[in-house]
Amino acid sequence: MSFFCDSYPIIDKKALGEGIYSYTLKCPEVAENAHIGQFVQIKAEGYMLRRPISICSVDKENGTMMLVFEVRGKGTDKISELNKGDLMDVIAPLGNGFTVPAKKDGRVIVVGGGIGTPPLLDIAKMYGDRCTAILGFRSFDKVILDKDYSLAGANVIVCTDDGSTGVHGTIAQPLADELAKGDVAAVYACGPTPMLKAVVAAAKQAGVYSEVSLEQRMGCGVGACVVCACTVIRDGEEKVLRVCKDGPVFSGEEVVL
């Protein structure tokens, strides 16, 4: 695993919603080496532990990386004080990402739940109109990146728990409907564990390969502290792996959710 530890200039910052921000960094070496589904560890000034944030998108040609995160505590609140022109101290890219085939046969479905929506964007950019993006949120004011997915050419289905926009309810029925259409090569998902369970179950029932990116508390981010353990069934045996180093992406056939 090749990663870099450095401070990179912030060239853009946007507020996507209440407490949700996107940052674009100029970091050519990270952009060149990053894979879809990997993450970074960001240093929050005054705090010992870094905060893990998924990579939303990279532009290898321009040497940039976009990160999207939600303020969920004092650490991410401190990071959100950084502005355009400041330096962001990151370790990146980390972990193992999605195994997205270069040969793009068939369709793919990406399923994002809330702040699990960002790490799937580059899959939509790769597949364009052969990607269906099912994005679930609590309400209209929590919806993010739906326009970015549309600009990538994806067929976008937004779901909200309260019905304030898009499909009223969870991602379950839209996912079942899309799988029933057939010609689906894979399903990729990131979001809350109950959603991931539903995605894996639906994909298995349809006989479609799936991968999920786990949301997990982390310490070191490089596999040393074993804070972020998860269980998989591999070769008929139960094994404990580290989300940060062995993941955060795992096959739906293996991971125990």
Predicted regions and their residues:
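Local cysteine-cluster metal-coordination motifs and their immediate loop/turn environment
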Residues: 119, 193, 216-248
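Structural signal for conserved beta-strand scaffold positions within catalytic alpha/beta enzyme cores
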Residues: 12, 57, 158-160, 212, ...
